[in-house]
A protein has these predicted regions:
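Short beta-strand scaffold segments in enzyme catalytic cores
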Residues: 25-33
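A short acidic/small-residue loop/turn micro-motif
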Residues: 43-45
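Helix-adjacent hinge/juxtasegments
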Residues: 50, 55, 59-92, 96
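Short, basic and Ser/Thr-rich N-terminal targeting/leader segments
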Residues: 21-25, 69-71
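Zinc-dependent deaminase
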Residues: 1-17, 84, 88-162
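Short secondary-structure boundary/capping segments
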Residues: 27, 66-67, 116-118
Length: 162
C-alpha cells in the first residue's frame, strides 16, 4: 500500500483529536500492510505533556507486537515529530518515518534540528510532505478557531474580581 493511504489513517486520528479540542496530530504505525499502533494527541485530555500521538502509537505497537523494538515498522504522523517523539522513535528502532506537515517551532527531524542525523545508534529513513497540504490545513484551521475563541472570551484585568 502507498504512504498516502496510511497518512489518511493518521489524518483521521488527527481529526478525532481536533474534535476533542486537542491539537490535531495523528499517528499510525504499520508493519507490512497492517496498522499495529494508533495514536492521537491527548495532552489536554490526559493533562500530560507526554500524551503525544507518536508516544501513544509506539506504546500500542510495542504491546501488540510483544516487544519494544519496532524494526519492521513505518511510523506515519501528520506533524513533524518533536524532540521527545523523535527520541522515542530512535529508541524503538523504527526504521522509517513519514510525516505530513513541517513544524517550524518544534520539529526535531528537519525543521529546528535533526535528531535522526546525530550520532545515535539508530537513524530512521525520513519521507516528508506526504499529504502536507491536508495536514497543514487541519492545523491552521484548528489554531485559527482557537484564536477566535480566545478573543471572544472576556479578559481578566488586574484589580478586578471577575
Amino acid at each position: 500500500m502507498e504512504d498516502a493511504y496510511f497518512m489518511d489513517e493518521a489524518l483521521a486520528l488527527a481529526r478525532e483529536a481536533a474534535a476533542d479540542g486537542e491539537v490535531p496530530v495523528g499517528c499510525a504505525i504499520v508493519r507490512g500492510d497492517t496498522i499495529v499502533g494508533r495514536g492521537r494527541n491527548r495532552r489536554e485530555t490526559d493533562k500530560s505533556a507526554l500524551a503525544h500521538a507518536e508516544i501513544e502509537a509506539i506504546g500500542e505497537a510495542c504491546r501488540r507486537l510483544g516487544g519494544w523494538r519496532l524494526w519492521e515498522c513505518t511510523l506515519y504522523v501528520t506533524l513533524e515529530p518533536c524532540p521527545m517523539c523523535a527520541g522515542a522513535i530512535i529508541n524503538a528502532r523504527i526504521p522509517r518515518v513519514v510525516y505530513g506537515a513541517s513544524d517550524r517551532k518544534c520539529g526535531a527531524v528537519d525543521s529546528v534540528c535533526s535528531l535522526f542525523s546525530m550520532e545515535f545508534n539508530h537513524h530512521p529513513q525520513v519521507e516528508s510532505g506526504v499529504r502536507e497540504a491536508e495536514c497543514g490545513a487541519l492545523l491552521t484551521e484548528f489554531f485559527r478557531n482557537l484564536r477566535m475563541e480566545l478573543r471572544s472570551r472576556p479578559r481578566w484585568k488586574p484589580g478586578s474580581n471577575t
